[in-house]
Amino acid sequence: MKRTGLSIVSGIIMLSATNSCQKVVTLDLQTAPPQVVIEGEVTDASGPYTVTINRSVAFYADNNFPAVDGAAVKISDDQGASDSLTETSPGIYVTHMLQGRAGGTYTLKVTVNDTTYTARSTMPARVNLDSVTFDNTGGGRFGRKNNIRAQANYRDPAGVKNYYQFVLYINGTRFTKDIYAFSDRLTDGKNITQNLRMDSSYLSPGDLLRVDMYCIDGNVYNYFNQLSQATGTGAFNTAAAPANPSTNIGNGAYGVFSAHTVSGRTVTVN
């Protein structure tokens, strides 16, 4: 399976000067000690699934995140299945036989230099992405001719708390300028047309756009919601941003482990 990936390391560099609790602390951004950053996922699509392990860098350092090799990585589920991951390249660990399923609870265990980090995520029920359309209002900002916005269309199931993350690929390249994470707190049971806002310079007529919709659990949503605030991206850009996002990974690591469903559509921008 093509790695969908979470790609949150770049957002972590501006957070690496704080500890894992919610209290704001002041540290020297140039000399903050590196922290382990773990990105992992299990989906309802066919495996293999990937766990990436890096170390954070100081705020003013180059965006070269040292890979953590030689870690022991295992993912298990609530039915007794367990998969020990293989390191295929520095810091990249992949599963062998694990198959994700909606409703399953998955536990990630990572051991680095005798320190063990654990995380747990339950995969929600699948919600299908029905279609992707475009809103072209014209009169783009800064004199641009186009102001094209992608819209994800789907029906939210009633009576259930649902959380969604959207990942976009433009002409095969993942769009990483924004974080798209939403809850159904105000839209429960409704037909949703979700605007996926981005700077108008990123979409042009004729581009091939793929939109993947993830159904994520509440802890993963909280992580990306807070990360978008802290990094000034996405729909949750507020002045009262937390110093660092609350992660579902224990023992002081940064990052997130997500078990989620995937529903995707590929369309040509018009």
Regions found by a protein language model. Give the residues of each.
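Bacterial N-terminal signal peptides that target proteins for export
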Residues: 1-9
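Hydrophobic helical h-region of N-terminal Sec-dependent signal peptides
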Residues: 10-14
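C-terminal motif of bacterial Sec signal peptides marking the signal peptidase cleavage site
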Residues: 17-20
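A sequence/structural signal for flexible, mid-protein segments enriched
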Residues: 22-270
